[in-house]
Amino acid sequence: MAAPLKRLLLAEPHVVALGHRVGRREASLGPDPGAPVRVRFAPSPTGFLHLGGLRTALYNYIFAKKHQGSFILRLEDTDQSRLVPGAAESIEDMLEWAGIPPDESPRRGGPAGPYCQSQRLALYAQATEALLRSGAAYPCFCLPQRLELLKKEALRSRQTPRYDNRCRNLSQAQVAQKLAVDPKPAIRFRLEEAVPAFQDLVYGWTQHEVASVEGDPVILKSDGFPTYHLACVVDDHHMSISHVLRGSEWLVSTSKHLLLYQALGWQPPRFAHLPLLLNRDGSKLSKRQGDIFLEHFAATGFLPEALLDIITNCGSGFAENQMGRTLPELITQFDLTRITCHSALLDLEKLPEFNRLHLRRLVSSETQRPQLVEKLQGLVKEAFGSELQNKDVLDPAYMERILLLRQGHISRLQDLVSPVYSYLWTRPAVHRSELGASSENVDVIAKRLLGLLERPGLSLTQDVLNRELKKLSEGLEGAKHSSVMKLLRMALSGQLQGPPVAEMMVSLGPKEVRERIQKVLSS
């Protein structure tokens, strides 16, 4: 333990104000209305970013951008034993992938850094010293074994476990005696009865008399690392956070945080607690559900725009729910006062439809389409590799034609490399015996189709082909139009089902259609 802190533990506390004490009414008003909006997303890198975290980050981001403010990423990495390798980097990667990058962060830096709590220990020590000096905090020498016994006894009696404040009123002599044995005690904060009420921007006027239901909380552990309660207050103050938008699970802790603000003489920010994001059946999103992590969605072809759309569509904060909103539209339409206290129920079965809408919008965009072409090229190479007999299928113009023809029919780019679309990239091995028609009819139909392809001045659009293909069965005994289309679909794709034959032909182009028909005839 640092020498100044040890001296404070041995000194008689002086109950003095560290600044002006924040009154009950002041605590509800928060920062100066003219102050710049600064919000933060403060995840713990003990895991990777999931949909619940994305929603909290998104609400902070769009609130900041709507008010020309700053969005800050702060990593709460004080629980060193639970850190997951790579999680810190992945969290920031996923925010950038989602299109909501922070203005200040561990990676980007900024005027209020550092942005990892493990690098801000001196600030927490300073705040702890101030609280010890004023008598608002005290050392706790209770062993983990004793605390565990308290917990077990409470549970046995069907009571909520709480610390019994045993070390709260130790004399100076007792503190000195215990410091000789345990020079690194934990530091606890004295909970007071008079908790300031505060006006939550979602839940309204709120007050929790925490001292009546909780023991004094640890704010600084014996290893010098703070707990969440101290760290978030100190960081929000020093980072000039104007509004705290966080999950509703922290609502009951806010009174505790206001007591800390009051003891330190600091002005608290405004608070807005967001209702939980739940599964469609009302159950909690579980981190054990592997498919709720953003990396899963990114790897399986879902667009960030679709995720942002669905997690706002199922909740509140907007005048109406509608599918297909873009991020600029979310920023424009967002209204914090419209967030209700009701949990948001997320139906992930609808995500493919959301993705379909946003993929269609991107395909229709002249500026966005080249990026989709590049991604599709990578998917085709990965899926088919050496099976690609014709490298022309990787040509950007061909890829673009496929995207434009299939827009609205596919939910993800990955759909285009599924077995049903394999004919776009590889030539099927089809024998004429598989076509389900007499050999004579096959020859006639093939000859007519090849003649159609050679007809001068004929523009082979889908509309023209749909009209001309109806004529292929004319005069053929027992040959219906539907059976002819089935034959051609098999010849071109090796499949019984798929897109309309006219679209297949436009997709493949006259040269490839001719080669496939001739290949079947010669088999």
Curated annotation (Swiss-Prot):
Gene transcribed to yield this protein: Ears2
Single GO MF descriptor: glutamate-tRNA ligase activity
Family: Belongs to the class-I aminoacyl-tRNA synthetase family. Glutamate--tRNA ligase type 1 subfamily.
Protein name according to UniProt: Nondiscriminating glutamyl-tRNA synthetase EARS2, mitochondrial
Pfam families: Anticodon_2 (PF19269), tRNA-synt_1c (PF00749)
Tree of life domain: Eukaryota
GO BP annotations listed: glutamyl-tRNA aminoacylation; tRNA aminoacylation for mitochondrial protein translation
Assigned EC number: 6.1.1.24, 6.1.1.17
Residues that coordinate or bind ATP: 50, 249, 284-288
